[in-house]
Amino acid sequence: MANQSPSSGDGPGGIPVGGSDGRSLAIHVVTRLLGLGIVFGLGYLTRPIWHGLVYSVFYSPGMAIFGGGAALAALALWFLPPFDVDDDTNRSFVRVLQEADSPVDILLGLGGSPGGKLRLFVTVVGVLAVLSILISIPAGMLEQRTLAQQTMSEASEVEEFPQANPENPRVVPRQVADITTRGSVSYRQYRLGASDIARMENGSLAWSYAIQPDGFRNTLIEHQRGVLVTDMTRMDDRQIKVYEEQFTYGEGMLLHRSADWNLKKTDYFAKYNDDAVEFSHDGRPYMYYPKTGHEWHLTPLPHTTPTWDGGALLHPDGEVEHLSPEEARSNPILDGQRLYPLTLTRDETGSLGYRNGIINQLPTVGAHEGQIEVAGLPSGANNAQPFVIDLEGERMSYVTAMEPYGEDTRGLDEVWFVDAETGEYTFFGTDDETLTGPERAMGIARSADSRTNWGQNFIVTEPVPVTIDGDLWWHIKVSPTDFTDVTRNVFVNADTSRTVEIRDDEAVRSFVAGSVDDEALQPVDEDDDDQDVVYYILVTDENGDVVERIPVERGQDTTIVDPDDERAQGNETAAG
């Protein structure tokens, strides 16, 4: 019987506990821990880069299975000691690469313990991928259903449309603002970033821009220079205000100097899907980033839904204030600004097709009872839902027009309003009455003026809903094809398809207020016959064709009344 050192004996199960084998195992574990520590250290320092992947693993059922399972499998195989594999080839990795014709050949050609571990890992990843797909499909449907039910439970129906703020009509479309504003400023090392909607210090709505570094060298070295806001409520004498102050972290700055990097570094478990809201307060520039979080629901199958997680207020000196919804609403710097995420509103209204259940909306077996969907916009609209408008009392609101389910439906079924400060939902249901949608309204605006060379010289653009005396109108702009001006505003009544053309900024305000002050209006046409006409009221039929064009001259005013109003009784001229 051979002598056996106690230090080299095996413990239960044949696992080495001492001697050289035990020391090898200890060295293996220490080495792997060191390698893992280096990986985690580098990952932590660069964590904003991996934010999307890590967040989805924590809050996406499919990615939790695939990404989380793959990470656990990798850790297990990483710490698993080398195991014996019968391999007669004993080829080096370099030789395997040279002789392989495809990645599969490399995978099958690797020998020894590394090759065995890699093949096992690939097998596990393949199984996890299939499982994640099988889980993601029902989890996605459950997410839509739960989100729709939450949205409906928190919403209240209104009997009439809330009144728009007549002092803040959206006169200047985004593309017109972008072109005219960029043509009015000159920066050699900077450019204007993407436009967004904010409130100016005087209460007007404005298109806002970050003044950010331009060019690769400047994005590495220079800082954001401040913010620029331009009034969207008037085309004449439009105000452009620049608030220049260097931002420590900002837009258009790369890596650790960027606002995005520092937002994710300071609050990792939140999504920053919305663009920054650039604005000023007491003459200083700021930027606000709405935040979206997610919450888990375990029944009937684990799934998540997005929620409002407050926002981040970025100061020029680099301070990042992470605010809860309540803190954001009470912050004096953010008074009057929009706080609720636009992207979350888009998700919530987009889920409403599931409000009557998953089966109801399925393409083959679904009854589609009460199913609605976000109204489509034509390609030339240069806008996207939800629309941002200002209501009375300087309350910004996100408006989404919903149409009945179906490819051929273009009329409106419901109109949803979201308070941009509180996230509260209200909606107006049309019941049996069908309102004109944005696509049809743009067609009516074009047909209302057959003398304009549409498409060649002028286009109708950016339909925005506006509520006037309880009625919904579509406020459409007519612009040259180069988007250098707004030649006139066209209002289309969503109920009657009645059309009003106005060229004057102050007249737009008067019309939205429910009255028209015609003294400041300009003639619609330059012809001698129309020199006293300040605007036209266009009456269209059900197809949108103009059947009557009523000129309103200087000294005249218009009032919209119900048919049973005594002022409308016996007016044969108007009726005939």
List the model feature ranges, each with a label.
Residues 3-4, 11-574:
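Soluble extracytoplasmic regions of secretory-pathway and membrane proteins
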